[in-house]
């Protein structure tokens, strides 16, 4: 796989199941080592498909977990997490336990935890895949708002081609296993983007056609 992401870019990666999208994120985050080739990347944090919130911790303590692992004092870690909660629409839920939160709220807490890692690159693995359509659309907008306040380079893995086009600056399309980049689509459209925009529909069809051709080879 030959791939790059510019600083501050939101790069979406789409491809069929089993093509190596999650493995790619794990390589970027240093959780796996490449068997060949080279990888150059700024420090990166992974937000996995499941939120993995610890049930015995409050929302704010879950978000502050990366800071605590980095030996930031508990009070300071909570203060930083609470400040981010206020910015990201989580104010008032600081002391809630995970089971008291909706799926969308849990994902917001998980994203806050990833942000508080302080890494320059965020790797998001299907962050909205388990959510209903309405909540998913709300969180897509929320993600862009959050990144406008806390800019990062983002690599977003998704099975949803439309989601990729709505959110990303560029979409990399992978072939079936063994995954390789078979297309890179620049999304030079202003935000917010609407699903019904003719340009979005055209780009979605282009991406789906590339995916289909890759599967048939």
Label each PLM-derived region with a short phrase.
Residues 57-64:
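Short coil-to-helix segment of the ABC ATPase nucleotide-binding domain corresponding to the Q-loop/switch region
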Residues 75-93, 145:
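Conserved ABC ATPase "signature" region
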Residues 14-16:
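The feature captures the beta-strand-to-loop junction immediately N-terminal to the Walker
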Residues 97-101, 105:
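Conserved ABC ATPase signature
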Residues 29:
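Helix-to-loop junction immediately C-terminal to a conserved catalytic motif
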Residues 116-120:
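A short, proline-enriched helix->beta-strand linker immediately N-terminal to the Walker B motif
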Residues 122-126:
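Catalytic Walker B motif of ABC-type/P-loop ATPase nucleotide-binding domains
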């Amino acid at each position: 796989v030959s791939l790059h992401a510019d600083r501050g870019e939101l790069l979406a990666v789409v491809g069929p199941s089993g093509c190596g999208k999650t493995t790619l994120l794990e390589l970027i985050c240093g959780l796996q080592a490449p068997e060949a080739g080279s990888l150059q990347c700024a420090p990166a944090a992974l937000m996995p498909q499941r939120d993995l919130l610890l049930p015995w911790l409050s929302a704010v303590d879950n978000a502050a977990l990366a800071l605590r692992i980095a030996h930031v004092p508990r009070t300071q870690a909570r203060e930083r997490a609470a400040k981010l909660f206020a910015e990201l629409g989580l104010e008032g839920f600081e002391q809630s336990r995970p089971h008291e939160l909706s799926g969308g709220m849990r994902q917001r807490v998980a994203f806050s935890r990833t942000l508080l890692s302080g890494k320059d690159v965020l790797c998001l693995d299907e962050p909205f895949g388990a959510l209903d359509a309405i909540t998913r659309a709300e969180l897509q907008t929320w993600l862009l708002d959050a990144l406008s306040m806390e800019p990062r380079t983002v690599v977003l893995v998704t099975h949803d081609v439309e989601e990729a086009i709505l959110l990303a600056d560029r979409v990399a399309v992978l072939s079936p296993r063994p995954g390789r980049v078979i297309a890179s689509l620049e999304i030079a459209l202003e935000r917010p983007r609407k699903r019904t925009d003719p340009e979005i529909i055209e780009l979605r069809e282009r991406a789906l056609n590339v995916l289909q051709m890759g599967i048939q080879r």
